[in-house]
Amino acid sequence: MFITRWLFSTNHKDIGTLYLLFGAWAGMVGTALSLLIRAELGQPGTLLGDDQIYNVIVTAHAFIMIFFMVMPIMIGGFGNWLVPLMIGAPDMAFPRMNNMSFWLLPPSFLLLLASSMVEAGAGTGWTVYPPLAGNLAHAGASVDLTIFSLHLAGISSILGAINFITTIINMKPPAMTQYQTPLFVWSVLVTAVLLLLSLPVLAAGITMLLTDRNLNTTFFDPAGGGDPILYQHLFWFFGHPEVYILILPGFGMISHIVTYYSGKKEPFGYMGMVWAMMSIGFLGFIVWAHHMFTVGMDVDTRAYFTSATMIIAIPTGVKVFSWLATLHGGNIKWSPAMLWALGFIFLFTVGGLTGMLLANSSLDIVLHDTYYVVAHFHYVLSMGAVFAIMGGFVHWFPLFSGYTLNLTWAKIHFIIMFVGVNLTFFPQHFLGLSGMPRRYSDYPDAYTMWNTVSSMGSFISLTAVMLMIFMIWEAFASKREVDVVELTPTNLEWLHGCPPPYHTFEEPAFVKV
């Protein structure tokens, strides 16, 4: 019974739970790796050997956090759990394909871990640029294992994307129009389209790299008429939409949380929010070369990518100000989930501002591959995506489990995490402006102070992670039942109680407008 329920599951709630558990476990591995990085950089001098092992840790940290933590939790966990409930569907459109999407991830994770264990490991950074990733600079199986791992994770995401698109377009009840769909459902739809369009390009790029390494092709080798810059174009055509894939479901969750805890019936500017997400999704595909300002593009090309990148700030600003307008005049409830949402809005905006600075091709020449870039994307990921995940988790935990967290501890947890991540990443702006480059295991002692501060912050974040594990244990141990939840048009997922029955919406639902 246990085997049939959890191994062969076709139930969206069970698969969502599997995704959440897998993402939490992978997140702890990724956090451990990030602490190794910060321990190495906590003071000048060497801690862990040479730069190769350091870069293997950096590479594994990036891949694990992106492909095995943020995406499984946001799209697999929250997406599977909430999308069918929010649109009144009995399950996902392809329940068995849903199961396969999940079970492709553990083998993929295993291959990634194997890549860091065999030979010298893949010390390429998550971008896996040739010629460093070629068979001379990285002889052995490591990079090949990484490529296979990415293939499996990519197939998993593509299948999941097909499933979500079909479910959202096809499985709404007849009375529900696309414009009565909750914003989280919209965000998952846009995310799924981005995945479906960008992942095949990554698959092509890394397959060409695989044949360059093993079958003597020369796609990326100038000696045979190839060009390593081609790989960068292919990778970033995937890589830039990918960062929007990581944040868009978070936008959807934040919209729900802000609306709910402001005591509002609906978010401010619903259609504006929908159009903003679709604009971000479209623009995300036409700005990729802003990651490549230093490879020597024409000045007019650089001008275009600078301008196009800055345009993305407009729909993003629409979303930020709509969240603030949703808060305005509301009866605000300072719950832990609301704290995460407010922290998200502030810190994501800070990360967006540093991104505006980096969008300038001339400034980026100076700041490229320094800690300024690291600070920028960790503000939008470590304090954007992660804060959205945490807010969504404490908000929907009663729905998933039927029990409530201790709200005092949840607030303390937020404060510790807030202090920790800011102490970790704010000083990295200073390091970057002072010219400290990324992906080095050591540094001149002029950079000691801010690196030490940054490493202290990372250990504060670690205590926050440990407190969260304890909070979850405490909730299941204490078994506090859930009070009745007020139903509004934006939180129909609570309709069936906490937790909902194994099968929901077995008959078509009707939407009263």
Swiss-Prot record:
Its cofactor is heme; Cu cation. It is found in: Mitochondrion inner membrane. Binds 2 heme A groups non-covalently per subunit. Coiled coil: none annotated. Its EC number is 7.1.1.9. It is an enzyme of class 7 (translocase). It catalyses: 4 Fe(II)-[cytochrome c] + O2 + 8 H(+)(in) = 4 Fe(III)-[cytochrome c] + 2 H2O + 4 H(+)(out). Its main location: mitochondrion. Gene3D superfamilies: Cytochrome c oxidase-like, subunit I domain. It comes from the Eukaryota. Na(+) binds at E40, G45, S441. Cu cation binds at H240, H290, H291. Mg(2+) binds at H368, D369. CDD domains: Cyt_c_Oxidase_I. Residues 41-50, 118-140, 213-227, 287-298, 358-370, 434-446 are mitochondrial intermembrane. PANTHER family: CYTOCHROME C OXIDASE SUBUNIT 1. Component of the cytochrome c oxidase (complex IV, CIV), a multisubunit enzyme composed of 14 subunits. The complex is composed of a catalytic core of 3 subunits MT-CO1, MT-CO2 and MT-CO3, encoded in the mitochondrial DNA, and 11 supernumerary subunits COX4I, COX5A, COX5B, COX6A, COX6B, COX6C, COX7A, COX7B, COX7C, COX8 and NDUFA4, which are encoded in the nuclear genome. This is Cytochrome c oxidase subunit 1. It comes from Dasypus novemcinctus (Nine-banded armadillo).
